């Protein structure tokens, strides 16, 4: 049998197929099914800044709800131990204990303080690694690209100071010079780069004249941009390369590995072709290796 093992973030993977962060990965039963289907690792559904800020706002509201009442009318402030991001952390720990394959947490924050606070909490759950999802849409005409890049690199520097687990960063291709940005992040000792994330893309229903929120899946052929950057980065950075977007088949995975990637992330193909497709992808890879005489 062909040897499909690889290494990513210092983790030994049985093959190069990692399931990226998505709604499926937040369900423990589905996580087990992904593991049984052959996934080498899973990235747990992202924790977003909005969830964290919402919990804080709700807590503030709950803690002051009874301030004008007589103290004998209430017992204690509401217990929110397992709500919002706290529930996310609780479920993350449960998921880690349920799986035998590596589990990577994903965080999508905005403020520097939030990044630092929550990477510490995430590390305490026992996960094997951390993926920081940099999803930044500037709303100011005065904010230049360099200031955004400097802020992100500063965040990465602080995160690396505060955790010992391996850290990867998931980036968009929309930088002035992506290679330069990755080199600077690599100098901060980031362990891996996931290329690329998918932005939320709005739509408008012209009949109802209102916003529509389509399910934003990638398409076959979308792999060509990450393929290009896997090749450009290979042997030029210390961090690992994980290709993401448009990877639908075992042949797509092979393309990425040949270009220089250490592993790949898949999501859309799981939604479209279901969990068992991971096995089909692995079979395609094994057959290709056998035909080539590789072991």
Placement of each model-derived feature along the sequence:
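N-terminal amphipathic alpha-helix/helix-capping segment at the start of soluble metabolic enzymes
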Residues: 1-18, 87-97
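N-terminal binding-site loop/beta-alpha segment at the start of enzyme catalytic domains
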Residues: 9, 15-33
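Short, basic, glycine/proline-bearing loop/turn elements
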Residues: 12-18, 75-78, 166-167
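Thr-Gly-centered strand-to-loop micro-motif
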Residues: 20-21, 220, 243-244, 266-267
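Alpha/beta enzyme core
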Residues: 28-68, 86-104, 108-242, 248-261
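Extended, intrinsically disordered, low-complexity segments
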Residues: 63-74, 223, 231, 283-295
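Short acidic (Asp/Glu) and glycine-rich catalytic loops that position anionic groups and cofactors
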Residues: 259-265, 282
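Helical hairpin unit composed of two closely spaced alpha helices linked by a short loop
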Residues: 265-269, 273
């Amino acid at each position: 049998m062909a040897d499909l093992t690889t290494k990513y973030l210092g983790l030994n993977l049985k093959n190069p197929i990692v399931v990226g962060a998505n709604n499926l990965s937040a369900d423990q039963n589905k996580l087990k099914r992904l593991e049984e289907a052959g996934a080498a690792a899973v990235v747990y559904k992202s924790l977003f800044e909005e969830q964290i800020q919402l919990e804080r706002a709700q807590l503030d509201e709950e803690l002051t709800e009874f301030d004008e009442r007589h103290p004998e009318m209430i017992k204690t402030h509401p217990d929110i131990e397992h709500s919002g991001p706290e529930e996310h952390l609780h479920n993350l720990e449960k998921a880690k204990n349920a799986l035998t394959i590596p589990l990577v947490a994903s965080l999508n924050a905005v403020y520097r303080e939030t990044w630092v606070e929550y990477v510490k909490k995430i590390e305490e759950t026992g996960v094997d690694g951390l993926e920081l999802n940099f999803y930044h849409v500037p709303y100011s005409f005065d904010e230049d690209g360099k200031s955004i890049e400097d802020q992100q690199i500063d965040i990465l520097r602080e995160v690396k100071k505060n955790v010992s687990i391996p850290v990867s960063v998931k980036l968009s291709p929309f930088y002035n010079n992506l290679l330069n940005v990755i080199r600077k992040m690599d100098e901060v000792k980031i362990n891996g780069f996931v290329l690329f994330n998918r932005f939320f893309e709005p739509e408008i229903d012209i009949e109802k004249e209102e916003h529509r929120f389509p399910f934003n899946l990638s398409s076959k052929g979308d792999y060509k941009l990450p393929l290009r950057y896997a090749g450009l980065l290979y042997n030029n950075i210390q961090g690992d390369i994980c290709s993401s977007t448009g990877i639908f088949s075992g042949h797509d995975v092979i393309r990425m590995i040949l270009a220089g990637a250490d592993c790949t992330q898949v999501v859309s193909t799981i939604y479209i072709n279901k969990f068992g497709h991971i096995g089909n992808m692995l079979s395609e890879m094994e057959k290709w290796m056998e035909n080539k005489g590789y072991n």
